[in-house]
Amino acid sequence: MKYFYAINILFFLTVNIGISQTQSEKKKIIGTYNKEEVSSLQSFIDRVSNERNLRVENFLTQNPSVDRNKVIEGQSYQIFDVLDGEPIYRTVDNVNSAIATRTNFLHNGGGLGLNLEGQNMNVGVWEEHHARNTHVEFSNGTFPPASRVTLADYNSGSSEFSDHATHVSGTLIARGADAFAKGMAPQASLVCYDWNNDSNEVEAEIQTNALLISNQSYGVPIYNSQGGQNAPTWMMGCYNIDAQLWDAIAYTYPYYLQVLSAGNDGQSTYTGGVASGFDKLTGDKNAKNNLVVANAANPSVSSEGDLLSLAINSSSSQGPSDDGRVKPDIAGDGTSVYSSTSGSNTSYGTFTGTSMASPNVAGSLLLLQQYYNSLHGQFMKAATLKGLVCHTADDDSSKPGPDPFFGWGLLNSKRAAEVIQEDTSGGSLISELVLNQGEMYTKSFTTTGGSPLQVTICWTDPPGGNQSGSLNSTVPALVNDLDVRLKDPGGFIIHMPWKLLIFNINSPAIKGDNVVDNIERIDVDAPVAGTYTIEVTHKGTLLNSSQDFSLIVTASDFSLSNDEFLSKNFKVWPNPVKDQLYYSFKSVSQGDVNIEITDINGRLVYKNT
């Protein structure tokens, strides 16, 4: 038998991240959409939106003294819905941020040599108002300058710029005219909408432009800034119709990931929650398929990218969801973030909140999509991206495993990018798979042990049942319950995934059968050397008879056991390459082996048989 191996290598002198969200890439993603599911989703969005608008209009008609919009202590509030007869308002919930999440290692001149800055990539932002698109940070660096920010629904007669929208957008894509304000993806483009009709507009952007990532730094707070309770008690932690709606969008469009702020109610207290000091997430922040971001308080990181200290900002809203799911999902740095503001084309400001942590994460994830596409010619599904960043996040060492403060930990863009690179040479595994009804998926791999071993599965789950009005309902929102198990080399020890204890949420996470989360991660801190076997199964009947899922595996000297994946035994170093390239290959075949090494632009740089 003859084996052929084509290996992509990064060369410092020739690297050029040119593959990104081109029209052909957009068409490829758009071509995967199911027209019947799209039509059903659009009807659902319209129904929810129309019913909500009718409730608001009827309330305003019956209460003419109440304003739809108001400003309290400089913060804007707008009636979002009317529940239990009361108006529900919503409100808005960076060099240092890039360092904290190690995103700077991906930039031009960063320690990984990747030169990823969002070239030809696009991100969506929904905000209370619009970003000042003429700000110097949003120019494309040409003369005459052109803005990289498109104001999609801006009306010069009635729309306005806001500091919040301009600051969030700067955290995402500021080019670094002021070096201290450089954003996560400083060469990316951004489309900005106000928050009215957000679900309709997101769906349209996905349909038209294959939107991969959106940032939404707003939500329904527990209290307004005058101290009055804004949200009904049942709403905190509840999988309500808003969570259901955004899960429906994600399930219909599996490449789209909604990134949003957890909220700033960390110090708020109320009566009737799951536990004192917890259960403060509202609306779509309780969805399953999005990425909800907590606010870390200026994490300390070494020059090599190692985390030195980690603490949560006390204002960051705590989870979990009422059914015990891990929420928030991950943490970013949103404390004292310096970025652009709307006062002028050269104004800046320092803000704190999960509103700032969310774009820190969203912009970083855009670069990870860019990198993966440059190596594979396609983007990751949202479940793969979410699973990857939760797999590689830095854990809060005071509480091993996930928790309702940080989620899975602080985003580590550097480690996530390294796993993407290792996957191409067999040092780790990132795989997008399908589990059919009644099947068991198995995969074996070997490791030399010593350093931690991790296995993660993540999937975009169908929307669950609407629990609106139910206080602290523990009914799982999970529809397709997949399970991952890991057998040790002797087959006698079965390692289980993490899970939270909803009835004792103050206690650390434990390991066991997880029946609520659509991400499951197994950690083995001190694995023995040998061959391990991953098993993925499901409970009950799978909706639609199958479930796509993503698998991420990292371990010391990792290698797959199957001949089918023999190319994973091909090792190349260093990568990126400066002067000399080395490779080794341990063959289990007596057949011929053809080796071709190309750079990421497709140029052949080495060939041998």
Where are these regions (language model features)?
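Noncatalytic accessory or regulatory domains flanking protease catalytic cores in secreted, cell-surface
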Residues: 349, 402, 481-551
